[in-house]
Amino acid sequence: TNVAATAGVSIATVSRVLSGKRGKDDDIARRVREAAKQLGYSVNYAASALRSDVTKTIGLVIPSATEPFAAQLLDEIEPTIDTESQQLLLGIGATQEAQAERIESLANRHVDGLIVVPAAGADLAGTLNQYANTLPIVQICGRQTAPRVSVVGIDENAAMEAIVKHLAEQGIASAAYMAGNELSFESAELFATFHTHMRTYGLATSENWNQFGE
């Protein structure tokens, strides 16, 4: 009531602005937000969730917060979610078991959506399928093992072919393979893809040249 009076609008307008349901970002919305800030008012998301079944939260599960890819992903996702008046809930798990626990925990918090970056070698199909019918889930990278989950990733076969083709076009006659020490199906598949395209484009390689490790 005080926020509405200070902003000079109705209580219903205050509710729509602060809940994110009012599409316009105009002078009225700015007055409401300024009045709420001035009066120290904050939205009770738990109470709002009970009334609307919307928690205004997005869950993000990653293997590590220190990896460059994960750090960049956080830098991109958080401002976007903040712009949409959402809250980001982060779960970090370096193993399949840890990530499954984080996914379950976030789902039990009734997040409105879930973004998952699988850990190396993690098969989260069972866990993701368990919640995919009622929770929008997007998987970033990794193999698509859960058919009801959207996946944003790289066509690694096409990428490897483009790399080997480029080497061949530059007159390179041989190449070695260097990768991390991740022992996963994805790593083995990519290594096999490398050999396939090396043979296709007539480039030489040797098992003695291959290096794995940090």
What are these regions (language model features)?
Residues 27, 45, 71-73, 101, ...:
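Generic recognition of short, well-ordered alpha-helical segments
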Residues 11-16, 50-66, 166, 173-181:
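Short beta-strand segments enriched in small/hydrophobic residues
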Residues 8, 110-111, 171-174:
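Short loop/turn motifs at secondary-structure junctions
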Residues 81-92, 177, 195-214:
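Short beta-strand elements in bilobed, periplasmic/extracellular small-molecule ligand-binding domains
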Residues 35, 76-80, 127-131, 189-201:
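Alpha-helical structural signal in soluble globular domains
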Residues 1-55:
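N-terminal helix-turn-helix DNA-binding module of bacterial transcription factors
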Residues 161-201, 207-208:
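An alpha-beta-alpha
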Residues 56-165, 169:
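Alpha-helical recognition/docking segments in bacterial nutrient-uptake
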